[in-house]
Amino acid sequence: TDDLYNILRTRLFEEVGSEEDVLEIIEGYKDALNEARQMQYTNYTVDELSLGIKNAYPFHPSIRDLFARFKENPGFQQTRGYIRLTRLMVKDLYTEDENGIIKAKEKYLINAYDMDLNNGELATTVRGIKSSISNAIAHDIADNGSSIAEIIDKDTGKTDMQDISKLILVSSL
């Protein structure tokens, strides 16, 4: 709900972008959305996108739908679990990595795939939602550079395979 996103904004961020910042992000996403609509990848409208970003900012609006799918999971404590998971994601995004990069500085919106499953605390939280996926995470998504997605991404120099794999994972929780 919108109340949950207000709680997250208040508890997780000292400050969030201005209304002008949000409108600028919406404009950038509109172009990508229009291109996706032309290719018939989505039927999402510009109005739906605008409202979704305004309500969920600084999170991508799709995170609401994806996380809502697993809030009924017995291993997930609904609001408390949602706050814990997003807190860990945000903490990780704002922590400098081994290369001195703060990932949050490169993001316009926080997506469901913005979780480092090589981060022990974050991985433990995700595995706690559905423990049966532990082997799949290690084999397919994140195993300190040894998973299938990490190997493919190393070859391409991008994180696309891990991002897609994490979206599928979150959808299955």
Predicted features along the sequence, with ranges:
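Conserved AAA+ ATPase core "coupling" helix
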Residues: 2-13
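Short alpha-helical scaffolding segments that buttress acidic/His motifs in well-ordered protein cores
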Residues: 8, 67, 167-168
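C-terminal helical "lid" subdomain and adjoining coupling/linker elements of P-loop NTPases
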Residues: 18-25, 32-164, 173
